[in-house]
Every structure is written in C-alpha cells, then in structure tokens.
C-alpha cells in the first residue's frame, strides 16, 4: 500500500542550486524529500553529504532526457506514495560562452534537456500532484532578455494568454530547425539557445497553470517559473553574485507557498517578486 506521507522531488539535485534547494527542503518541508540525479554515483554522494549534515533525503535516479527513466520514477512515486506534493524541475544544461560546438547542435542538445525533458517530466508527474501541490520550474533571467530580443511577431506569440502546449512545442521545434538551416536570426530568434529553451519553460509554466485552473481549480495546485539569479555554480561561474543557497531562496519560497495561497500562479518570479512577462 502506498504511504500517505507527503513527498517533494527535485530534479538535477546533486549539485549547485538543485542541491541547495534539496538541502533547504530537507530542513523546511514536512515529509520526504527525493533527491534525483542522472548519475547514480553523484546522486548518492550528494545524499551522503546531506546525511552528514543530519538531513535525510532519499535518492532516485532520473535522466530527464529518457522517458523510461521518467516513467520508472513515476511508477515509484505511485507505489511508494500514491502522489506528489512538490515538484521542482531544476535539471538543466548550458554550453559555455567559449564553446565551439556548432550553434545548431547546441540548440538541439539544450532543447532536448531544458525544454523537452522538463515537459516530459511534467507530462508524467503532474497527474500525480496532490491537492495543494506546488510545481516550480526553474527558468532564468536570460529568458526575459531572449524574449525582448525576439521579433515583435514572436514576442506576441510567446506572450499570448491563449497559446497552447502544442503551439509552444511547434515554436521550440521551429527554433531548432531554423538554427539547422542557418536562418534563426532572419526568422526573428535571438542568438541564445539557452535563453530560448528557458522562454519555453516559462511559457510552459503559464500554460500548465491555466490548464490546472481550468481542470483542477478546486485543488489549488500552484505552478510557477522562477529565476534563481546569477549563482556561483559550474554553470554560473566563480564571479556570480549569489551563493547556491541564495539562488535556492525563490524556488524554495514557491515550493513552500502556504496551503491557503491563491498565488503566485502561472507567473515568472525573481527574488520572490513577480516579473512582468
């Protein structure tokens, strides 16, 4: 029989902001905290580090680019808990500025993890969300810059209050195809694959929020995208202005919004404040 214990899950949780989010949830969330990572050894090492601090996370392997891996996690959650209370989608990749990998390959690889993988996790796990659940999709301030660098026509599409998930997926695919053809700039796209994937995650959050309000309005499940800020991680580099713990503050705030909270919902949140999209 599944336990009725509350459970929170963090993807990409073995280092950086994901690790800091997991540590904070272990301290503040009343229930089990699942630390997930693509690499089992790195994930177990992260769990041991938190155990040495007197915390008790559980580990489950998760590769968000592998549907079988996502479904194995989904089945585990169903069996062990029968549901999910908090989902923090943090797993991400980014190419360094100096990376010489051709841009169209960077676009394809970044999209596969940051947008497609996050979307697949949501498709499989959102149906498990319990009433009062919280979904946090970790995005980035680069998505705002990327949006402002899009053509007016693309900006209008990404800001639409009625855009569907299918339309969003179509736009993300078009970006990758346009990079392969070498026409992404003339088609109105910015020159940042990472920024475009994070635009996708932010708009996906808006769509998910709308869908949950329409179909499960009484359950008060809140979904938001957020920016942790510029954080000293492998990705952010050593000169960034925030520690991982400071970067975790907004995602954790959204993950632990009180049960009676009406919002934020379907918003892009930075430093615990809603940013205009």
UniProtKB/Swiss-Prot annotation:
- Function according to Swiss-Prot or TrEMBL: NADPH-dependent reductase with broad substrate specificity. Catalyzes the reduction of a wide variety of carbonyl compounds including quinones, prostaglandins, menadione, plus various xenobiotics. Catalyzes the reduction of the antitumor anthracyclines doxorubicin and daunorubicin to the cardiotoxic compounds doxorubicinol and daunorubicinol. Can convert prostaglandin E to prostaglandin F2-alpha. Can bind glutathione, which explains its higher affinity for glutathione-conjugated substrates. Catalyzes the reduction of S-nitrosoglutathione.
Q: Which residues bind substrate?
A: 140
Please describe the organ and tissue distribution of this protein's expression.
Answer: Present in liver and kidney.
Effect caused by changing residue 215 to Q: In clone RCBR6
Q: Which Gene3D superfamilies match?
A: NAD(P)-binding Rossmann-like Domain
Q: What is its EC number?
A: 1.1.1.184, 1.1.1.196, 1.1.1.197, 1.1.1.71
Gene Ontology biological-process entries: lipid metabolic process; vitamin K metabolic process; xenobiotic metabolic process
Instruction: Keywords in alphabetical order, please.
Output: Cytoplasm, Lipid metabolism, NADP, Oxidoreductase, Phosphoprotein
**Reactions that this protein is recorded to catalyse:** a secondary alcohol + NADP(+) = a ketone + NADPH + H(+); prostaglandin F2alpha + NADP(+) = prostaglandin E2 + NADPH + H(+); prostaglandin E1 + NADP(+) = 15-oxoprostaglandin E1 + NADPH + H(+); menadione + NADPH + H(+) = menadiol + NADP(+)
Phosphoserine: modified positions: 30
List the cysteine pairs that form cystine: none
Q: Single GO molecular-function term?
A: prostaglandin E2 9-reductase activity
- Which sites bind glutathione? 95-97, 106, 193-194
The protein's name in its UniProt record: Carbonyl reductase [NADPH] 1
């Amino acid at each position: 029989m599944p336990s009725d214990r509350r459970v929170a899950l963090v993807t990409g949780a073995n280092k950086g902001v994901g690790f800091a989010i997991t540590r904070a949830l272990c301290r503040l969330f009343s229930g089990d905290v699942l630390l997930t990572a693509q690499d089992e050894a790195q994930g177990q090492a992260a769990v041991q580090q938190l155990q040495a601090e007197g915390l008790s996370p559980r580990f489950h392997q998760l590769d968000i680019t592998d549907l079988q891996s996502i479904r194995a996690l989904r089945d585990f959650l169903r069996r062990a808990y029968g549901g999910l209370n908090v989902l923090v989608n943090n797993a991400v990749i980014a190419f360094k500025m100096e990376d010489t990998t051709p841009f169209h390959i960077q676009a394809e690889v970044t999209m596969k993890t940051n947008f497609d993988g996050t979307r697949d996790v949501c498709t499989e796990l959102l149906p498990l969300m319990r009433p009062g659940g919280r979904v946090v999709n970790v995005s980035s301030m680069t998505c705002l810059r990327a949006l402002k660098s899009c053509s007016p026509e693309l900006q209008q599409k990404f800001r639409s209050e009625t855009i569907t998930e299918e339309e969003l997926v179509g736009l993300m695919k078009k970006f990758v195809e346009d990079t392969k053809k070498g026409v992404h700039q003339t088609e109105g796209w910015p020159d940042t694959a990472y920024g475009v994937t994070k635009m996708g995650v932010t708009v996906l959050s808006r769509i998910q929020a709308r869908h949950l309000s329409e179909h499960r309005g009484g359950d008060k499940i809140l979904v938001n995208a957020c920016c942790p800020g510029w954080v000293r991680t492998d990705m952010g580099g050593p000169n960034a202005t925030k520690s991982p713990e400071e970067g975790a503050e907004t995602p954790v705030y959204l993950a632990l919004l009180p049960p009676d909270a009406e919002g934020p919902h379907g918003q892009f949140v930075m430093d615990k404040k809603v940013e205009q999209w």
